[in-house]
Swiss-Prot record:
Record keyword Ribosomal protein present: yes
Membership in a protein family: Belongs to the eukaryotic ribosomal protein eL15 family.
Disordered as annotated region, ranges: 163-186
UniProt xrefs under PANTHER family: LARGE RIBOSOMAL SUBUNIT PROTEIN EL15, RIBOSOMAL PROTEIN L15
Stored HAMAP family: Ribosomal_eL15
UniProt-listed GO biological process terms: cytoplasmic translation
Keywords associated with the record: Ribonucleoprotein, Ribosomal protein
Name of the molecule in the record: Large ribosomal subunit protein eL15
Keyword Chloroplast: no
Source organism of the structure: Methanosphaera stadtmanae (strain ATCC 43021 / DSM 3091 / JCM 11832 / MCB-3)
GO molecular function: RNA binding; structural constituent of ribosome
Domain of life: Archaea
Gene behind this protein: rpl15e
InterPro entries listed in its UniProt record: Rbsml_eL15_core_dom_sf, Ribosomal_eL15, Ribosomal_eL15_arc, Ribosomal_eL15_CS, Ribosomal_uL23/eL15/eS24_sf
Length: 186
């Protein structure tokens, strides 16, 4: 019971990080994170409450990786050929994929033997966004014998980050909304 109360307060603190202890905590951690590699495997999640809500368990077979991704909309090169600057189509163009989905795909490429379960936002500064990605090892016996997660071991869940089967992928493909009115989302 005590853990659930703790998670409740952690959730509230992360909802408004500027008004809670989270801002000071990140001010200490961010200089270290900037010097570390872009993708780094970490021992335990920074936001344990969020990770557990998304399916993380502290046992063998589960891995958490933190990734740094650039901020902002799509980087599009300027045309060399002549045209009206208005028709160049350089500014205000966003990509099809969200930055979170890009983060999941990059981590999946780094760890090809693991499957992406889910991911969540951790922090952002002027240049980058930081996400933590929860990965699962489908070959691990503790995962294969756990009825709550062994669905990820089947072949139809291979490379799920690249096929948009994670939560961020489904959101970007417009699959969160159903029924009347959702026609233009997809």
């Amino acid at each position: 019971m005590r853990c659930y109360i703790m998670y409740k307060y952690m959730k509230e603190a992360w909802k408004n990080p500027d008004e809670s202890y989270v801002k000071e905590l990140m001010r200490e951690r961010l200089p270290k994170w900037r010097r570390q590699p872009v993708i780094i495997r970490i021992d335990k999640p920074t936001r344990i409450d969020r990770a557990r809500r998304l399916g993380y368990k502290a046992k063998t077979g589960y891995v958490v990786a933190r990734i740094r991704v650039r901020r902002g909309s799509r980087r599009k090169s300027r045309f060399k050929n002549g045209r009206d600057p208005k028709r160049m189509g350089v500014n205000k163009i966003s990509g099809e994929k969200s930055i979170q989905r890009m983060a999941e795909e990059r981590v999946a490429r780094k760890y090809p033997n693991l499957e992406v379960l889910n991911s969540y936002w951790v922090w952002e500064d002027g240049k980058a966004k930081y996400y933590e990605v929860i990965l699962v090892d489908p070959q691990c016996p503790s995962i294969q014998h756990d009825n709550k997660i062994n669905w990820i071991c089947s072949k139809k869940h291979t490379r799920r980050a690249f096929r948009g089967l994670t939560s961020a992928g489904k959101k970007g493909r417009g699959l969160n909304k159903k029924g009347k009115g959702a026609e233009k989302v997809r």
